Each structure stands twice: as C-alpha cells, then as structure tokens.
Amino acid sequence: MNSMFRFWIPKTSISMQLRMLSTQTRQALEQAVKEDPIVLFMKGTPTRPMCGFSLKAIQILSLENVASDKLVTYNVLSNDELREGIKEFSDWPTIPQLYINGEFVGGSDILASMHKSGELHKILKEINALAPEQPKDSEEETTKKD
Amino acid sequence: MIRRFFHTMGRQDRIYKTLSEALKTDKITLYNDSYKHSHHIAMKGVPDTNETHFRLEIVSPEFSGMSRVARHRLVYGLLKDEFDGGLHALQITSSKTPDEVS
C-alpha cells in the first residue's frame, strides 16, 4: 500500500515540484478513497493507534459493528507525503479522517456526533457495511446437532 | 503595533480572538487539553507541547444553514495560521447556531 505514495520527482522549479507532487498525491488519494467502501486515515493501526482521536475513530467503527473486510486503514505516520497530502486533499487539517464510498465524512468529533445520533449506523447499514449479526437460533441448531 | 501585540498573545487567546471576531460571537468555550497529549509519539520533536491540543464549544449565527462538516471546516479555515504554526488538534465538540441552542 505504501508504495502508492512513493514517486520520482524530477528536478524542476519549486512551484512545479509542489504542483506535480500535489497532482500525483491527489490522484493516488482519489484512487485510495474509492477502492474500498470505508477508508480511514489514522495515526497508527487499528490494533496500535498512536493518538487518542484515531483510537476513538476505531472504537466507534467497532461499536457500529463494521465488517472488517469493508474497512481499510492508512497509517499516516508511516508516510509524510500521505500525512500532509490527505489534509490538502480533504481541506481538513487533522487526522483521523473517514471516507465512505469515496466521500469525506469527517474527523473523530463528527464521527462521535453521528454515532451518538444514529446517523452513522444508518449510512453504514444502507451500504451493507455492517458485519452480519449471528441469528439467535444458531445456538439452538448447534445444540440440536449435539 | 497591533501586529506586535497580536503575536505576544498566547495561542488560546489568539484562537478566541480570531473566532469571536470572524464568527460574530462571544459564546466560545475553549479548553486547553495539551497536557493530555504531550507524551504521544506524534508529539515527539514538537518544541512546545503546551499549546497544541484544544477543545472548542461555540455558538454562532454564521453557522446557519451549514452542515456539521461545513461548520468545522469554517472554523479550521479561520485557524489555518495556527495549524501551520504548530496547533495539532482542535476538537469541536459543539458548533451550533443560537436557534439550535435555545
């Protein structure tokens, strides 16, 4: 995944370099946010978040019962171009940032509000991103088999 | 003169002043949470960890008709210089219009 964000930058004027970096970064990010239904740019990883706000974002998605195969995370601490590029891309100065079906949803504060209001659950359900709930009779079936 | 005075203000005061003027409100509560974050690895190498993390509650008529994302973006945009200058995080736990509060 990280290789997506490594480029060869030709030596040109600074403004040209910035423009080219920005264009390539933008294209990589546009692709990244569309490849999967739910994309979270965070500090650290889901199992080792490196800041409280990224932890909160992961906890909210976990509480919402998001299916693990629907969510992809990018660790911005592993790549400075990614860390700065995503802020420009979204016009949002902080990490974490959540995208659903390619659309920017918000940072940890907005996720918290949407989780509390039920709005986030509604969106995730509509796009079939929730893990299937275990049917109640499955335990009974198991018992019968025994 | 004014510029020099402005830059002697601490970050918390600058944030308050910027937002109160631009958003036409004095209903701003700003908490400094920096001490909670100073040990984070992401803060390694940051020279001044005393004014990096703030938490904001704000009421402004300028938010009328705006989505939550748009409201936060407006606030973040007004504080771009602070983010460029070392502000790491601004939690916005409440951004409402006067009508929404009453």
UniProtKB/Swiss-Prot annotation, chain A:
Question: What CDD domains does the record tag this protein with?
Answer: GRX_PICOT_like
Q: What is its main location?
A: mitochondrion
Q: Sorted alphabetically, which PROSITE patterns does this protein's record hold?
A: GLUTAREDOXIN_2 (PS51354)
* Keyword match Phosphoprotein: no
Sites binding [2Fe-2S] cluster sit at C51
Task: Provide any one GO MF term from the record.
Answer: 2 iron, 2 sulfur cluster binding
Q: Which GO terms describe its biological process?
A: [2Fe-2S] cluster assembly; [4Fe-4S] cluster assembly
Q: Which SUPFAM superfamilies is this protein grouped with?
A: Thioredoxin-like (SSF52833)
The positions annotated for binding glutathione are K43, R83, E84, G85, I86, K87, I95, S108, D109
Give start and end of each Glutaredoxin domain: 26-131
**Compartmental location:** Mitochondrion
Upregulation details from the record are: By nitrosative and osmotic stresses.
Relate the assembly described in the record: Homodimer. Interacts with ISA1 and ISA2.
Family per similarity comment: Belongs to the glutaredoxin family. Monothiol subfamily.
Q: What is the official name of this protein in its record? A: Monothiol glutaredoxin-5, mitochondrial
- Provenance organism: Schizosaccharomyces pombe (strain 972 / ATCC 24843)
From Swiss-Prot, chain B:
Provide the Gene Ontology terms for cellular component: cytosol; mitochondrial matrix; nucleus
Q: What induces it?
A: Expression shows cellular growth phase dependency, with the maximal expression at the diauxic shift. Expression is rapidly decreased when cells approach stationary phase. By UV light. Expressed maximally (3.2-fold) at 4 hours after exposure to 240 J/m(2) of UV light.
Q: Where in the cell is it found?
A: Mitochondrion matrix; Cytoplasm; Nucleus
Which GO biological process categories is it annotated with? cell division
Q: Name one Pfam family in it.
A: BolA
Phenotype reported upon loss of the gene: Leads to delayed spore germination and the unidirectional cell extension is not followed by cell division. Proliferates faster with smaller cell size than the wild-type cell during vegetative growth, but no other significant cellular anomaly, such as defects in septation or cytokinesis are detected. Sensitive to UV light. Shows a normal cell cycle delay after UV irradiation, but displays aberrant septum formation and defects in cytokinesis when released from the UV damage checkpoint. However, chromosome segregation is not affected.
Out of the domains of life, which is the source?
Eukaryota
Keyword set for this entry?
Cell cycle, Cell division, Cytoplasm, Mitochondrion, Nucleus
In the record, the note on similarity to other proteins reads: Belongs to the BolA/IbaG family.
Protein purpose: Acts as a mitochondrial iron-sulfur (Fe-S) cluster assembly factor that facilitates [4Fe-4S] cluster insertion into a subset of mitochondrial proteins such as lipoyl synthase (LS) and succinate dehydrogenase (SDH). Required during the last step of iron-sulfur protein assembly when the iron-sulfur cluster is inserted into the target protein. Probably acts together with the monothiol glutaredoxin grx5. Not required for [2Fe-2S] cluster insertion into mitochondrial proteins. May be involved in control of cell division, especially during the resumption from cell cycle arrest.
Q: What is this protein called?
A: UV-induced protein uvi31
Which source organism does the UniProt entry give? Schizosaccharomyces pombe (strain 972 / ATCC 24843)
